[in-house]
Amino acid sequence: MYRLQISWSRIVPDGDGEFNEEGIAFYNRLIDDLLARGIEPMICLYHFDMPLNLAEKYNGFLSRKVKEAFVRFGQEMMKRFADKVKYWIVFNEHNLYFADGFEHYSGVLKKELTLSDMYTVFHHTMLAHCELTQFLHENFEAKIGGMLATTEIYPATFSPTDNLYLRKFDEFYNRN
């Protein structure tokens, strides 16, 4: 198995316009080469590569318009490659969109961020994930899932307080 990411910015440079056929041809050749060598490809549709135009114009996944543009991109990639690729990931490390620093992964350029902004980004990315999952299941014989970030953590001491903090952090960060 070989996991690759199709760069949204390479395929749709402005994020919501025309598809770059040269970029699609590159990934088509890559997938064919993997399969010819007996290597099963797994496609990730988003690995922190928000098209700059969408970040500047709409503040990334804070906008439902960006969610819609991403779903359009994802559906097109599925139409192009799902006959050859049986394993899909929508968002790399999707749980990071619901944690401190979410703006770095979601194309948000806004300086003053609120808790509501984080909820909005997570809501829009979850909607995109659900829409693409439904699209894939309704149209192709393929599997789709998520990719979560985890962090190995240890208590500073053996004290009950440090261990309680560790459990709370682990539950929120690694298991949400």
Where are these regions (language model features)?
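Catalytic domains of carbohydrate-active enzymes, especially glycoside hydrolases
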Residues: 1-7, 40
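Non-catalytic scaffold segments within catalytic domains of secreted glycoside hydrolases
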Residues: 11-176
